[in-house]
Amino acid sequence: MSDGGSPKRMFRGVDHVGIGVGDMDEALAFYGAVGFGDVLFDWTGDVPGTERFTGAGARNARIAMLANGGATPVGPARVKLVQVLDGDGPPPIPEGQAWGELGICEMCLHTRDVWKTHERLAGLPGGRSLMEPLSGAVVPTNVALDISYVSDPWGCKLEMIEWKGLWTSLPGEPRAEGVNHVAFGVKDMKASLDFYRRMGFEERLFESTDFFDPMAPWYDRPIPSQHMVMMMAGQGAAIEPCVLDPLGPDCRGEWGHLGAMEFAVGVTNLERAAAWLSEQGVEVHGQHTVDVGSGEWRYAYLTDPDGLYVSLVEPRY
């Protein structure tokens, strides 16, 4: 393939994070208040590609893609809300999930003024504080940050971060901007980094092997060690794979489960990106085009080293 199809040109970082919710109308109100008030599409139907996760037919769901009007280069990505409508409805958050177990464990929003934004989001109907704001710096880059956590009405962990040593937020009121990164638990850090490096996640912002003590109350078992690495692409949101020791429970859960459950890597051309990854030995499972009214939702699920719910997406909405 020519240089025009090289990973750095075709892949656009994390485009969105998928979050399972129990009631779409309530979720639209909550995330609209968070800052994701631009509804790019709101679609209901059988979701192509999910049949490979169920072993039967595709899941029926209502899906809304939301953008933040205050998105920035360090908070660029979107949120995809998913309400499973068939079967017994939305599957629960995987049992035993604290942070870093195998599966998607959080969505992080870049924020202007973590303290004031934390107070506002924790005070929203259904919102709850999980970690009070604090300041720190990451190693080995020594980039300063403010950080906190809240949860949505269904228990999804929402991290708020302001990378003070990386970016100066634009003027304005305290606010949550777009998605900065998605965090997920893996079994083998090297395998995951090698895999996602093919999609342009090549710049390391930090790497830590120390346990992040403010997370201790989330664990109902002996505290594990944490190996966390944040990798950035040239565009889009970043990824933060984590390996726990011991690994803890499998928290991948069913597709559409409550909380953060999947993410998508943006591409400029779905066919070319899928073909290039296939040449690299990555399993890409079909390519789907869904008419969502405002345009086309074009995507393809792929197999990552840990069987997480990950897709490519070419936004046309």
Describe the predicted segments one by one:
Residues 20-75, 141-143, 184-236, 272-273, ...:
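Core segments of cupin and vicinal oxygen chelate
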Residues 13, 59-60, 103, 144, ...:
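Exposed loop/turn and edge beta-strand positions of beta-sandwich/beta-sheet ligand-binding modules
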Residues 14, 18-21, 31, 76-82, ...:
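Short, structured motif recognition centered on aromatic/hydrophobic residues
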Residues 93-100, 256, 264, 273:
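Long, charged/polar, surface-exposed segments that mediate recognition or autoinhibition
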Residues 37-39, 43-58, 62-140:
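Ordered, small/hydrophobic-rich secondary-structure cores
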Residues 2-10, 41-43, 80, 108-175, ...:
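Vicinal oxygen chelate
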Residues 47-52, 88-94, 165-169, 212-217, ...:
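A short, acidic/glycine-rich surface segment
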